Amino acid sequence: MAIDKELQFTRNIGIMAHIDAGKTTTSERILFYTGLTHKIGEVHDGAATMDWMEQEQERGITITSAATTAFWNYNNQKYKINLIDTPGHVDFTVEVERSLRILDGAVAAFCAVGGVEPQSETVWRQAEKYNVPRIGYVNKMDRSGANFFEVVRQLREVLGANPCPIQIPIGAEETFKGVVDLVSMKALVWNDETMGAKYDVEDIPAELVGEAEEWRDKMLETLADCDDTLMEKYFDDPSTITEDEIIAALRKGTLAMQINPMLCGSSFKNKGVQTLLDAVCKFLPSPADTPTVEGTDPSDPNKVIERKTSPNEPLCALAFKIATDPYVGRLCFFRVYSGELPAGSYVYNARSEKKERISRLFQMHSNKQNPKEVIGCGDIGAGVGFKDIRTGDTLCDENHPIVLESMDFPDPVIGIAVEPKTQKDLDRLGVGLAKLAEEDPTFRVQTNEDSGQTVISGMGELHLDIIIDRLRREFKVECNQGRPQVSYKEAINDPVELREVYKKQTGGRGKFADIICRVEPADADFEGELQFVDEVKGGNIPKEFIPSIQKGFQRAMKNGVLAGYPLDQLKVTVIDGSFHPVDSDQLSFEICALQAFKNACEKAHPTLMEPIMKLEVVTPEESMGDVIGDLNKRRGQVEGMESSRTGARIVKAKVPLAEMFGYVTALRTITSGRATSTMTFSHYSEVPSTIAKQVLTEAQGRVDLIK
């Protein structure tokens, strides 16, 4: 029972937001107020505890997800908070994705001036995907142009959320000094002398009473929609609703993802962080609020297995991050969903089907490890000793295997060629790249078979900059880099039906496979690379050879017919075929499928696909014409323009990534440094034939196949 109680008072939460909304500063204040640090670290000084990589401290941004355990007393009860500080920059979106997969709740931070920005929209959608309940925190209330109510409106209109303010600010910009708590109807005013560690509870200032009552009524109305008991009281006599009932209704609505309680503050000025911690304890779920976790049987993917969130169940944990630590080596971060994980124990990896011994366990404080004997149910920890582990692997009891749903990561959109400067660097390069690729599923390393060049690919220029920086600092590798390359893909336009026969006679046993198949673009509602359909009747191709045909097509799709770019969104239907009782084997059918793919794609009007980026430019009115003119030259499509609250203009456009290299510098020149831009991946689209021919000529591809 004590363990269940401990679960009840545990919170696994993340802070997510657009870049520069103040996530790391908020995390630093949480560490300060919970007593984990005795001095506040500032991002702009390069001293933030959560930003522990040198590149993070230099650039003032968060790159990796730092995990920290803190404790907070609320209502005479000690709560354990596992806090993950995630990056806001779009190039590191994988860090957000894998953190949300294992969190129970999240704090969505918004800038009181910028409001809902492109990356805040991206992370909000990621949280929706993983059903993560959120509370909203409008930060930077002390800045010029801060407007809490405008941000609340944007949440409703841009994100389609149901924001429910439980506080309103007292003052704004330089006069911001506290908040009105709409639940207790008291004013909370922060004390500057104590670095914001203490605040005074006062009566609401007379000039705010009317506004506070109006917003309290809106809060109660929102809650009444989610809670039938409260609805009756709200319509009979709202004054009879108690504080405890409001808190219970807020928690219930948040857990059901019907509402998002909204708070405000200024983390940098030490105002609003304690009430945010209280709200985390009050409204966000504990591991016990998710009574079961679902997975599948490794031997039968259609069989669903449920595990209760209990220490008495067999072990079930998910590895969500791999990191290389200079002191302890390969570190695996995981979340325990059921059972317990003692140090020195063996665990079964459902993907590799191997047992691994975890030699040591840690609870993390940023990049420092605190040794632990056991990581309990519902907790987040890190371990060393794994030989073969990847992000998304399920760790379980060998006698009770289970596979949790893994994580999908986006394909890289940009690549650069790298070559070591000296022979000594060459030896270290392979080791460094392999370790970095283990840590980051959106980072890929390939060797060009023709030129022997090593090409590294990632989510953006900043992503690759930091990889090269880490090679230099952590692995002591100096390398030259080529110009950025776009990660093109290939696709086909037309359906093709063909017969492919593979026959080889070498004396003795030969090779034979015969396939009749239809190759065409995948169905519109299909998500993934290969949509494979088996329509073979009467055993003309034995069932044991069908997976080899599928494997052959999957292998072939990694190198398209135009210039060896990968191909996805393909549908292959195996209609018929034949086999030889002696000469046919799995390899014969795999090779036959490889040949069928090549011959079919050449006839199916192949086309080149390029990544299209969603671009948002904030520019002064007088530069708008130049900005739009420049986007038109870059094959951009302007989708809309609107005015920001600060009087600037916001231009929204879709632009091919190939045209966007060096855009930040060009934009600075056009607008005399007064504009900013954010870019996120949108989708892949067909390259116009004239440009496709240029690209294929440079890549020494099959220009003759482009119509």
Curated annotation (Swiss-Prot):
Is GTP-binding one of the keywords?
Answer: yes
GO MF annotations, alphabetized: GTP binding; GTPase activity; translation elongation factor activity
Q: Which GO terms describe its cellular component?
A: cytoplasm
Which family is it part of? Belongs to the TRAFAC class translation factor GTPase superfamily. Classic translation factor GTPase family. EF-G/EF-2 subfamily.
Q: What does this protein do?
A: Catalyzes the GTP-dependent ribosomal translocation step during translation elongation. During this step, the ribosome changes from the pre-translocational (PRE) to the post-translocational (POST) state as the newly formed A-site-bound peptidyl-tRNA and P-site-bound deacylated tRNA move to the P and E sites, respectively. Catalyzes the coordinated movement of the two tRNA molecules, the mRNA and conformational changes in the ribosome.
Q: Name the chain's protein.
A: Elongation factor G
Organism whose genome encodes this protein: Porphyromonas gingivalis (strain ATCC 33277 / DSM 20709 / CIP 103683 / JCM 12257 / NCTC 11834 / 2561)
Q: Which Pfam families match?
A: EFG_C, EFG_III, EFG_IV, GTP_EFTU, GTP_EFTU_D2
Principal subcellular localization: cytoplasm
* tr-type G domain residues: 8-288
User: Which Gene Ontology BP annotations are present?
Assistant: ribosome disassembly
Q: Which InterPro entries match?
A: EFG_II, EFG_III, EFG_III/V, EFG_IV, EFG_V, EFG_V-like, EFTu-like_2, G_TR_CS
Starting at the broadest rank, the lineage of the source organism is: Bacteria, Pseudomonadati, Bacteroidota, Bacteroidia, Bacteroidales
- Protein location: Cytoplasm
The record, for HAMAP family, names: EF_G_EF_2_B
Which segments carry the region annotation Disordered?
A: 288-308
Q: Which UniProt keywords apply?
A: Cytoplasm, Elongation factor, GTP-binding, Nucleotide-binding, Protein biosynthesis
Looking up SUPFAM superfamilies in the UniProt record yields:
EF-G C-terminal domain-like (SSF54980), P-loop containing nucleoside triphosphate hydrolases (SSF52540), Ribosomal protein S5 domain 2-like (SSF54211), Translation proteins (SSF50447)
Residues that, per the record, bind GTP = 17-24, 85-89, 139-142
